[in-house]
């Protein structure tokens, strides 16, 4: 579908965890929430494109919390990994040191908000 969540057929829209928007499949709750808000406005005669901010995914494991924000697969960059006995922090940065993704485990998950603020949006 396009960013208005329109299929190629007039008046048919798509919403849910299996929707591909402009080539991106984001099968998680937060993208659905953003899409539902945009689609509601569109169906109310106010055409609104869906925009996705950076949306890290929380992997719910009680023994070891994990938060991941994967970089675009076509992006060039390097992972920088720091680890200690209670945590792992992996940052994916481009050649100019712009943060494009991360993985946090254990105590490093406390850095989620600060790191997410530095990420680019998934779709503008």
Regions found by a protein language model. Name each.
Residues 3-26:
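Short FAD-binding loop at a beta-strand-to-alpha-helix junction that anchors the flavin cofactor
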Residues 18-111:
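Mid-to-C-terminal Rossmann-like scaffold of FAD/NAD(P)H-dependent oxidoreductases
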Residues 108-122:
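A short, polar/charged loop-to-alpha-helix boundary motif
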Residues 1-3, 95:
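A Rossmann-like FAD-binding core segment of flavoenzymes
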Residues 32, 123-124:
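Short, intrinsically disordered/low-complexity patches at protein termini
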